[in-house]
Swiss-Prot record:
It is a single-pass type II membrane protein. This is Probable dipeptidyl-aminopeptidase B. Residues 115-880 are vacuolar. GO terms for biological process: proteolysis. The gene is dapB. Residues 1-26 have a biased composition (Basic and acidic residues). The lineage of its organism: Eukaryota, Fungi, Dikarya, Ascomycota, Pezizomycotina. Glycans are attached at N533, N778. Belongs to the peptidase S9B family. The active site is at S724 (charge relay system), D801 (charge relay system), H834 (charge relay system). Its EC number is 3.4.14.5. GO terms for molecular function: aminopeptidase activity; dipeptidyl-peptidase activity; serine-type peptidase activity. The keyword Transmembrane applies.
Amino acid sequence: MPRQRAPKEEEAELLTKQERSARSSEDASDTSISSISTTSLVLEHINDPAINGTSRSRRGEKYTDEDDEAQEAFDVEGGRYKSPISVDKKTRRWLWIVGIACVTGWALALVFFLMSGSYKHVSTRPHDPLASSTKGSGKKITMDDVFGGRFYAREQSLKWIAGPNGEDGLLLERDAGNAEYLVVEDIRNKGDGDSSAKKTKLMQKSGFNVNGYFVRPVEVWPSKDFKKTGEPLDPENQDGRVQLASLSPQSDAVVFTRNNNMYLRKLDSKEVIQITRDGGSELFYGIPDWVYEEEVFQTNSATWWSEDGKYIAFLRTDESTVPTYPVQYFVSRPSGDKPKAGEENYPEVRNIKYPKAGAPNPIVTLQFYDVEKAEVFSVEIEDDFRDNNRLITEIVWAGKTKQVLVRETNRESDILKVVLMDVEKRTGKTVRTENVAELDGGWFEVSQKTTFVPADPANGRKDDGYIDTIIHEGYDHIGYFTPLDNDKPIVLSQGEWEVVDAPSRVDLKNNIVYYISTAKSSMERHAYSVFLNGTGTSEVVENSGSGYYGASFSAGGSYALITYQGPGIPWQKIISTPSSKDKFEKVLEENKALDRFVREREMPILNYQTIEVDGFKLNVLERRPPHFNEKKKYPVLFYQYSGPGSQEVNKKFHVDFQAYIAANLEYIVVTVDGRGTGFLGRKLRCITRGNIGYYEAHDQIAAAKIWASKKYVDADRLAIWGWSYGGFNTLKTLEQDAGQTFKYGMAVAPVTDWRYYDSIYTERYMHTPQNNAAGYNNSTITDVASLAKNTRFLLMHGVADDNVHMQNTLTLLDRLDLAGVENYDVHVFPDSDHSIYFHNANRIVYDKLRWWLINAFNGEWAKIKTAEPKAQVDARMERR
């Protein structure tokens, strides 16, 4: 289930002493004496009216330069001018004595302050390196700032590739500037004065003319020798629509899909060879159907070349038994087809093969094509899953061995099989089976990070093997399986933390594995390396401090593109890895313009913390208004997503709608990653299985009660909102809470009944409805009487949502109608899908959320409960 589309997502020490931190100590200050250094206290308050004798303006009054009569005597620039008074020697001597005594006293006080424990290091403060705490320190964040991309961090579009002769450190750079669209460059030359001459230019411009048409590439693949020239893929059908194209590893052939059939073009010939012939509207070759693209591959490719280019693996997808869901378009015609005469005023209907929970799934089988023999074949497995109980989630060629690893699960995603096939012998066997239903009652997430490790006896690797994610003592880690049919791994990482999309790269020369993990904090990401024997774990970036880092590694593992994503201003640099002989470091992006823009804005204070609910520690992010005052009472908005394995509380730099609410409207915004979310271990994650919505809602309510008890929170003004799964959990929370804690809620594109959502996602967490009818009933939003006990809630949905169908909101509205519940508002968006973008809709969503929330916290929705005509109110007042 994808999240809503919001402003791009997606504060710590920098990696080198030469680089400045994103926010210096002069920029971040607290009003609490116990949480700042005495030095900053003195410097900050030199001009404080309470110290120098001037009077403060009363709370609520705007700052003005026109001070009263009593103030003028103390002002030099703004007050009445008075001639300076001369000071004699005796007076100056006494001033020196008093000054020295003051400095001595201050020094003694500082020593006492530090020794007494009153001083708190910066790490103990709320994590707010970019926050504004000085009144009038900047401009307010606006909606135009957020949605206009002004807080977007620049990232250079780079991709590591291997050189023709195995060179390491080559970058494929897209849109590189200097009128060059696509270039290959050695990173060691990047930025040099004469680097332009050392670049290999693959494409000068971003497009070109073909037979009178201007063509722009959607994707590019460099040939192995960087010397291929552009020409039509199919000379006989140059204008034909191509659904997918894939270049062979040797850059000598292209396999492509057209009209759901597969074709092969060998580049030394103009001939196009048709591989399959029975593809059609319900049978696909080499590309996934809707549910596999959405929930498994998240791409339109289901085609895999062998490393030697002699075989092609591909999926055959038969969705003939999958039921159809109609999506209606009332304003536009996405197909581009002209309506038939007389049907101009009817909506266009797009019929999607959409398997809902419990419905028939597409039948997916793995097939192979022998390029030399021009033959399609399959490999039979003795103990394979039945066709209607099999999900194929990953294909990995085992180097040049003509073997392939296939990852499969059962329909409910709790039994995993790793199958090893030999395409030359056309045999296969299951080499590894895991059952997490028996282990911890959980599930397997879809993953495509399995990495083949070839044998190299001279380098200590006797047999071929592969690296895969494993479950080790309740956490996701990485293991090395060797030989290929071994089901017992060498454990490469371990601890009460988890790896993330690992491994990132394997350095075969030095037997080093690189990966990203949450070892320092579940809210952070850092890069690590470990040897293939499981020893020598070390951090790739020394002294990285607190932060959220991404890393991509060169083909040979000698270089890494490090992307610091927050919480401070993001930056990018390329460094040499510890295994590299030559030390190298080059800053690519510092986002100086963004840094200046942020410093001119009043930013929210970010307070990262954990709370305990039912013995589980949950991550929380509290966003406070820039000039937070504990003596005030603030309304609180809870924003969450809460989906299985997701994470919202992380230390990325992210100025979004929530930041706007906190910084501009001056509401507190809290995000809680409750049970079921990711990166805190399987015990916390898998407890929700079979009953999603219960623990997620329970934890939001528990957190809300904690905040409601805080002195600075107005307990009568608590609201919650979310999109997609977050919309579902918003409604589930309001249903479970029944107005006791939360008074308001806003749900966008929510699931209201999991029987309406797609099979692969839903059954992973809920089993099938046939096997868990009670769980589905519990997870459905049905208790409308409890929803009626909330002050008010808001529903929004895109009419053309092909992901979370409008059916979800409409069936809930019907339940509300039947029960006579009316304390809600509804807004639907014609022709908008799950992201709600059509015809300015996305901005309208957030404008609606903003104004609706303001009215809620202003008490307007409470008045509606007893609304009556103004004339009647006036008449009643007159009678009194």
